[in-house]
């Protein structure tokens, strides 16, 4: 259960049934997150929320992949011309496969799908592809570390793909990328 799923029926079913607001402070800014239902049965809440948001986050399970609700949410967010991020959760659960879900997203939505963060191969943290660093879980916090050698080759391939995709966003970024092969 999450902070937003407080209704007894939501707790019992372990799903979001109605949209709720969760304010978050980040970088000196207040961000109001609207937690909408993921199941297609509750699509009305998703459609109503589109009028109040500036971007969307579609959460996918590493075990289950792309659901009907996720596909519909993508269509609605795209039709509303809103930037969208896919977040793959439950990567640490049995039969969870982050990279299978990533491959499915790329197959369905094309090369515009590119990761910015991936799980470490040993399952103890995540790798930030933008800044080329890793964060290893240490109790309730994460320690910043170098990218593990076991992940370095794969990380380099994914970073290159990310930079190429980002470079295609504007003419200026494309020129910078072709000059330096980096976007930092």
Where do the language-model regions lie?
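P-loop NTPase catalytic nucleotide-binding module
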Residues: 61-184
């Amino acid at each position: 259960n999450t902070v937003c799923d407080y209704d007894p029926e939501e707790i019992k079913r372990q799903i979001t049934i109605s949209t709720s607001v969760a304010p978050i402070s980040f970088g000196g800014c207040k961000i109001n997150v609207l937690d909408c239902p993921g199941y297609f049965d509750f699509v009305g809440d998703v459609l109503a929320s589109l009028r109040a948001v500036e971007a969307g986050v579609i959460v996918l399970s590493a075990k289950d992949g792309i659901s009907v609700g996720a596909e519909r949410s993508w269509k609605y967010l795209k039709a509303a011309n809103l930037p969208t991020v896919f977040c793959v959760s439950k990567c640490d659960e049995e039969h969870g496969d982050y990279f299978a879900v990533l491959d499915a997203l790329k197959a369905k939505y094309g090369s515009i799908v590119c990761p910015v963060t991936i799980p470490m191969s040993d399952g103890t943290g995540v790798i930030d592809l933008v800044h080329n660093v890793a964060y290893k879980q240490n109790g309730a916090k994460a320690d910043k570390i170098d990218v593990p050698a076991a992940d370095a080759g794969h990380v380099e391939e994914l970073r290159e793909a990310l930079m190429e995709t980002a470079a295609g966003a504007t003419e200026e970024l494309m020129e910078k990328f072709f000059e330096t092969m980096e976007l930092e």
